[in-house]
């Protein structure tokens, strides 16, 4: 029986103040390892995401935008699943840059109106 890769999940809540253009790291980088995101969802809480154009999950080098939740579609309590209306996922099932982790961030500006965003990202870690 193979031991790797194992499916992992990064899940949590980030306050709007943490959804800046720099973002918040949700999976720490690990040298010589490659992350492949295979699914996930996001949900705004406390209001609709405003000011930022979108809330994105990307690699920590900011070269691959994995999940992009359009602000207008991130209304309070609505879960945006991968590739649903308002969520674009062009890098699902694609190995990201070796040694990178994952971050969640606001694009263009810090998120306002919504108080926070819940997230759940399913991913594989390979290499070593």
Regions found by a protein language model. Name each.
Residues 1-128:
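Surface-exposed, low-hydrophobicity beta-strand/loop segments enriched in small/polar/acidic residues
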């Amino acid at each position: 029986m193979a031991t790797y890769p194992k499916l992992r999940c990064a899940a949590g809540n980030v306050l709007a103040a943490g959804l800046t253009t720099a973002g918040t790291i949700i999976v720490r980088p690990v040298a010589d390892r490659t992350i492949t995101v295979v699914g996930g969802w996001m949900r705004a809480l406390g209001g609709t995401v405003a000011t930022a154009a979108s809330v994105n999950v990307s690699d920590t080098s900011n070269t691959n935008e994995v999940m992009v939740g359009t602000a207008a579609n991130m209304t309070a309590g609505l879960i945006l699943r991968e590739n649903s209306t308002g969520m674009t996922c062009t890098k699902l099932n694609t190995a990201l840059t070796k040694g990178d982790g994952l971050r969640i961030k606001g694009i263009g500006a810090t998120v306002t109106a919504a108080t926070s965003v819940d997230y759940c990202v399913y991913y594989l870690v390979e290499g070593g």
